[in-house]
């Protein structure tokens, strides 16, 4: 009797599963109370500042790293680095810095959207969700993994895009 292999749950799946308790919890907290609302805003601001500081520190580590003159073949398009036309490469330092800047841009745009939704229309759920998802987005930035956690061997460049739904990836196994 051979046991059927159960497919591994993709790493991003917990983010999708965490949404339901967050939405349920947001209905249980009285955000009409000024203290609760200000506490949520403070937590949101702290998450944004810590996420931005982590990305900025990673960017400093990228610029100070040795071996940045090595080349990455076929890095894909980005507004944050220039590819050499003759051999379709970019330096490792420029590539890693570009990936950190892309994540930083996503952070900034997300914060802008959340602030508009909250301060213009009064929604609080997006702030709660952002407090959960933003640190996981920073954690998933491969440049953060390589330069802050030393996971160089686990993430050979060019890095694959993380796009797609984790539920879809899990269902295809």
Residue ranges and their predicted role:
Residues 4-14, 24-42, 119-130:
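Membrane-lumen (extracellular) interface motif
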Residues 104-127:
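Alpha-helical transmembrane segments and their membrane-interface junctions
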